[in-house]
Amino acid sequence: MAVDYSLYLVTDRILVGPKDFLLSIRKALEGGVTLLQLREKETNSREFYDIGVKVKELAAEFGVPLIINDRVDLALALDADGVHVGQQDLPLAKVRNIIGPDKILGYSVSSLEEALQGERMGADYLGAGPVFPTGSKKDAAEAIGLAKLKEIKAGVSLPVVGIGGIGAANLRAVKETGIDGVSVISAILSQEDPCAAAKGLMDLWRN
């Protein structure tokens, strides 16, 4: 599957609120989001599944691949396009064995060593960061900065997406590292108009 990593939205239902969640995602997709990750850390499996069904329908309507954060079981149950795992989740090779060769497998990294490990173990893309300090993840590690992001991209052949503290003010600088896309949460979902926010980020990325 050819994947456009340019603008990768990670969801946060707590940030948006349950009432406006699906509408915000729709608006973000209308604005040009190219990849969508459903991340639900504060919910049970059934609720995650029910939300996932609706989000998958939205993603399919716009032809955007849906990635599930962490939950390999729910990625399979939903027949999502892929799954994204971190350093503390199931081993990458085990995840690849479970999901098979055709699903997209993403891996969170914060160093070149972790990136090379991800490449060896079958990741399709790497989420590198946090690039800048971020308030969207309570457990976020120390920011890696642009120099390390550039080092990670130069050291692997996989697509690399920058994540963490990225928004309109710093997106151009992030792009200059040579990475393949940016992953955002609040830069779209915290904005009054998620559609306009996504369009603005895509304009910055493409120009």
Swiss-Prot record:
User: Where does this protein hold Mg(2+)?
Assistant: D70, D89
Cofactor note from UniProt? Binds 1 Mg(2+) ion per subunit.
User: What pathway does the annotation place this protein in?
Assistant: Cofactor biosynthesis; thiamine diphosphate biosynthesis; thiamine phosphate from 4-amino-2-methyl-5-diphosphomethylpyrimidine and 4-methyl-5-(2-phosphoethyl)-thiazole: step 1/1
Q: Which cofactor does it need?
A: Mg(2+)
List the keywords (alphabetical).
Magnesium, Metal-binding, Thiamine biosynthesis, Transferase
Entry GO terms, CC = cytoplasm
Q: What is its EC number?
A: 2.5.1.3
A Gene Ontology annotation in the biological process aspect, one of them, is: thiamine diphosphate biosynthetic process
Metal-binding as UniProt keyword: yes
Binding locations of 2-[(2R,5Z)-2-carboxy-4-methylthiazol-5(2H)-ylidene]ethyl phosphate? T134, G135, S136, G165, I185, S186
- What is catalyzed by this enzyme? 2-[(2R,5Z)-2-carboxy-4-methylthiazol-5(2H)-ylidene]ethyl phosphate + 4-amino-2-methyl-5-(diphosphooxymethyl)pyrimidine + 2 H(+) = thiamine phosphate + CO2 + diphosphate; 2-(2-carboxy-4-methylthiazol-5-yl)ethyl phosphate + 4-amino-2-methyl-5-(diphosphooxymethyl)pyrimidine + 2 H(+) = thiamine phosphate + CO2 + diphosphate; 4-methyl-5-(2-phosphooxyethyl)-thiazole + 4-amino-2-methyl-5-(diphosphooxymethyl)pyrimidine + H(+) = thiamine phosphate + diphosphate
* Top EC category: transferase
For the ligand (4-amino-2-methyl-5-(diphosphooxymethyl)pyrimidine), the binding residues are: Q37, L38, R39, E40, K41, N69, S108, K137
One Gene Ontology term of the molecular function aspect:
magnesium ion binding
> Could you say which protein family the record assigns here?
Belongs to the thiamine-phosphate synthase family.
- State the protein's purpose: Condenses 4-methyl-5-(beta-hydroxyethyl)thiazole monophosphate (THZ-P) and 2-methyl-4-amino-5-hydroxymethyl pyrimidine pyrophosphate (HMP-PP) to form thiamine monophosphate (TMP).
Q: What NCBIfam families does its record include?
A: thiE
Question: PANTHER family from the xrefs?
Answer: THIAMINE BIOSYNTHETIC BIFUNCTIONAL ENZYME (PTHR20857:SF23), THIAMINE-PHOSPHATE PYROPHOSPHORYLASE (PTHR20857)
* The protein's name: Thiamine-phosphate synthase
Say which species the protein is native to.
Answer: Desulfitobacterium hafniense (strain Y51)
Q: Which gene encodes it?
A: thiE
